[in-house]
Amino acid sequence: MGWTNDYHLDINTQQNYWVSNVGNLAECNTPLFNYIKDLSVHGTKTAEVVYGCKGWTANTTANIWGYTPASGTIIWGLFPLASSWIATHLWTQYEY
């Protein structure tokens, strides 16, 4: 998952967990869910300061220290819906 010690909150992270439910390995989701929980705390500040919004957000790149602002080029680095994208894994777990 790591790209220079960061997580890319797009298909690069999610595809590592796709098999967890269908493979009867739901407990393997726990680290991702814990990470999403921690990220949401840091992403609350980003949503407020950068976008003037309530809730939380993250962009394409994030790390274990809670980095959530956009980085890199606009083409791939600006993805303020990454939090929604990664949260779909929570919903998939619920549906399963």
Enumerate the language-model features and the residues they cover.
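Substrate-binding groove/exosite segments of carbohydrate-active enzymes
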Residues: 1-96
